[in-house]
Amino acid sequence: MTFLLDVNILLILHDPHHQHYKPVSRWFAQPSSKPFATCPITQSGMIRLLLQGITGLDPFAMQEARDALDRLTEQPGHIFWPDTPAYLHSTKSIFARMQGHRQTTDAYLLGLAIHNHGKLATLDRGIRHLAGKESAANIEIIET
């Protein structure tokens, strides 16, 4: 099974001082966490937040952020998932459980994982509600 890493997981993997770095990096180092996927949304989110320095790190320079993404995507086991299918199609089974604007991206990433027969890897326990019973198998909550 392929794991689509959400943006928070991507950021934590770049910040050894983050409170969840150890459990996330331990999970990521396990062979069972491979293959792993990124998509345009998670890649651009990672770049944007590294540039802002929002993780507690100093803001990355543009080339540093690009290099960080290159290193990540060059790792063995990486798969790129394009943004297909369209948003409305991928969130159709999830849409009724969405509770607000903060879940729109999560819903799409979960829908993308479902479409690709994978799992969305996240720390966000609240996403279980969004998945419902029928999509619970498509979520990997990384324990902290």
Language-model segments: residues:
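Short, well-structured N-terminal submotif of metal-dependent ribonuclease cores
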Residues: 1-38, 50-64, 132
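A generic structural signal for residues located within well-ordered alpha-helices
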Residues: 5, 104-105
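A generic structural signal for short hydrophobic patches within well-formed alpha-helices
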Residues: 10, 43-46, 127-128
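Acidic catalytic patch
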Residues: 16, 40-44, 67-98
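Conserved beta-strand segments of alpha/beta enzyme cores
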Residues: 35, 77-79, 138-140
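Acidic, PIN/NYN-like endoribonuclease modules and their adjacent C-terminal/linker elements
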Residues: 86-99, 110-144
